[in-house]
A protein has these predicted regions:
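Short, flexible loop/turn elements at secondary-structure junctions
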Residues: 54, 118-120, 149, 220, ...
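N-terminal beta-alpha lobe that positions the nucleotide/phosphoryl donor
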Residues: 1-115, 210-221, 225-229, 234-238, ...
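Feature captures the catalytic cores and cofactor-binding loops of soluble hydro-lyases/lyases
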Residues: 301-343
């Protein structure tokens, strides 16, 4: 996987094999029957999300978040069938192959399913991710919530700077106002439904109106309600959780759309704190929000797009506008990453 061009060629070929292979008749019939029932329950022509869910046998702590594809605003059986095939094929995305190799996972030991969910109309409201642990420090007495306008993929992929809220669990349990910190994100872009129903084109990214980007995308009441639901989920699974949520702009309700174990901070020793100090001094060229606590150094390589990935050598500092999971194959090479936006 160190040769990113060879990785891209191999991954593309494997994915095409999967897409070109017809469904088994039994599976196709089962999908049709289940989708017809789902449409009836939705009451009319509804939009659906076709999502991936991967797991590895005997590796419950393996994290496959963001590795496979999700398709949003999918309408009709034919479009759902197409999306399911592409979800299955995404088990061999470049980033997924690279991740498994770096983690030492057997490609044959990873299982993948496609889930079909009715869409929450967060394109008319907001959505985001919340953690039942502080992702920076590992402190377990807070719920950390991120929120931005539109469909949640923008937050999940790190494509926007979202609003951030910290809710203190013990205070929330006492029924008192518990939002202890809030940061206003820039929220410059949002993902909404597109009028183009071609595969992979059902959503589009547009600018957020100036007034909206300069106000919070959730009220404190909504933030605390989300935190309450996050605690219920955490208590059920008995471990810190990573949860995706969405607000429906039509009915005004908050929905939980996905929950999975938090697999980074919860693995670390909560009694140990690492601190790194830069001994040298020089003029500060630029500043920003840090993700993580370590110090990286190396030759800065400015990349205009993901197509230039092969320019990165081990130890380089990757500088680009934004990264998403597709950049995973070279993230292991870089000593540090600097971007204009995302998180």
């Amino acid at each position: 996987v160190d040769d990113v061009n060879a990785l891209a060629r191999t991954g593309s070929e494997i994915r095409q094999w999967i897409i070109d292979t017809p469904f088994q008749a039994e599976l196709e019939d089962a999908i049709k029957a289940a989708f017809e029932q789902l449409e009836q329950e939705a009451g009319g022509e509804a939009s659906f999300a076709v999502r991936s869910s991967a797991t590895a046998e005997d590796m419950p702590d393996a994290s496959f978040a963001g590795q496979q594809e999700t398709f949003l605003n999918v309408k009709g059986l034919d479009a759902v069938m197409t999306a399911i095939k592409h979800v299955f094929a995404s088990l061999f995305n470049d980033r997924a192959i690279s991740y498994r190799v770096h983690q030492g996972y057997d490609h044959k030991g990873v299982a993948l399913s496609a889930g079909i969910q009715r869409m929450v109309r967060s394109d008319c409201a907001s959505s985001g991710v919340m953690f039942t642990i502080d992702t920076e420090s590992g402190f377990e007495d807070v719920v950390f919530i991120t929120s931005s306008y539109g469909l949640g993929e923008m937050v999940v992929q790190g494509a926007v700077n979202p609003d951030e809220f910290y809710v203190h669990k013990p205070t929330l349990d006492k029924g008192k106002p518990a939002v202890v910190r809030r940061n206003l994100g820039s929220k410059l872009k949002k993902m909404i439904y597109s009028t183009d129903m071609g595969h992979g084109k059902q959503v589009e990214i547009v600018d957020v109106e100036h007034n909206d980007s300069h106000r919070f995308s959730l009220t404190d009441t909504e933030v605390m309600e989300l935190a309450k639901q996050a605690q219920i989920i955490e208590q059920h699974y008995k471990r810190p959780m990573d949860i995706e949520w969405a607000k429906d702009g039509v009915d005004g309700k908050l929905y939980i759309v996905q929950a999975r174990p938090e697999t980074v901070r919860s693995r670390e020793d909560a009694q140990t704190i690492e601190r790194f100090h830069l001994k040298g001094k020089a003029k500060v060229v630029c500043e920003g929000r840090a993700i993580g606590h370590k110090i990286g150094s190396g030759v800065a390589k400015v990349l205009a797009s993901i197509e230039e990935m092969d320019k990165i050598q081990p130890g380089d500092v990757l500088v680009t506008d934004m990264t998403d999971p597709d950049w995973e194959p070279i993230m292991k090479k870089a000593s540090a990453i600097v971007t204009n936006r995302g998180g």
